[in-house]
Amino acid sequence: MDVFAVDEFVALVERLIGLPWPIRLDQFDSTAEQLGWSPTGNTGIFTGNFASGEQRIMCTKDEGMNASVFSIPFFKPEGEEIEKIGLANDAFVAYVAAGVEAWGKPFDSVIDRYAHVAWKYPQNVIADLIRYERFVHLRFYTPQGIRVY
């Protein structure tokens, strides 16, 4: 069993890359459902199932109401035990390896306490994978959000 859902990570980024940006955030609910996410009734907030269960996805918008940056807590183990905290690092390493295999060398990376690795695609989007002490987070910048990267 793939506890980190590496294939799901790659598949999600690929699906986000392929969306017909720009998409207005107030019209994103049907697209979210196609991604397997559930609208919450609040614009820009969705729920989805990831490697460590159901998580909340948040999306910011630009001045034109277009979706700009998605924040997705992809791996967040429950509990405070040191073993579970170590899982966040293992998940990050697994996702980076899968990303390098799928998309090649990242264009930006920092490896330290809060490590991150980012890939930029010809569609003018960025997938930024971030490892915090206790979880792994994916920040996806649409063409409308890329200027804030």
Annotated model-derived regions:
Residues 1-113, 122-126, 130-149:
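Short helix/turn-capping signatures at newly exposed starts of structured segments
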